[in-house]
Curated annotation (Swiss-Prot):
Organism name: Yersinia pseudotuberculosis serotype O:1b (strain IP 31758)
Family indicated by similarity: Belongs to the UPF0270 family.
HAMAP family: UPF0270
Coiled coil: none
Listed InterPro entries: UPF0270, YehU-like_sf
Protein name: UPF0270 protein YpsIP31758_3941
NCBIfam families in the cross-refs: PRK04966.1
Length: 78
C-alpha cells in the first residue's frame, strides 16, 4: 500500500529517509556524497513521484521504492 509522503510527520519522514539511505550501502560513484545530499536526493524523488513510500502488511515494514517497481510487483500479485 502506498503511503502519501505528505501525510507523514516531517520528523518521521526525515528519519525514514535517513534510515533508507543508510540501509542502501556503499556508494561507488566517482565522488563521495554526504548523507545529507543522499537524503535530499531521495526526498526529491518522493516529491517528484519517481519514488513512493510503501507499507508492507505482510512484513509490517515501510520502504521506499521506485514507482515503477511498486506497480510491477502489484500487478504480479493479482
Amino acid at each position: 500500500m502506498i503511503i502519501p509522503w505528505q501525510q507523514v510527520d516531517s520528523e518521521t519522514l526525515d528519519n525514514l529517509l535517513e534510515a533508507f539511505v543508510l540501509r542502501e550501502g556503499t556508494d561507488y560513484g566517482e565522488h563521495e556524497r554526504s548523507l545529507t545530499e543522499k537524503v535530499a536526493d531521495v526526498r526529491r524523488q518522493l516529491v517528484s513521484g519517481e519514488a513512493v513510500l510503501v507499507w508492507s502488511e505482510l512484513h509490517e515494514t515501510i520502504n521506499i521504492m521506485p514507482r515503477g517497481s511498486f506497480h510491477a510487483g502489484a500487478e504480479e500479485q493479482q
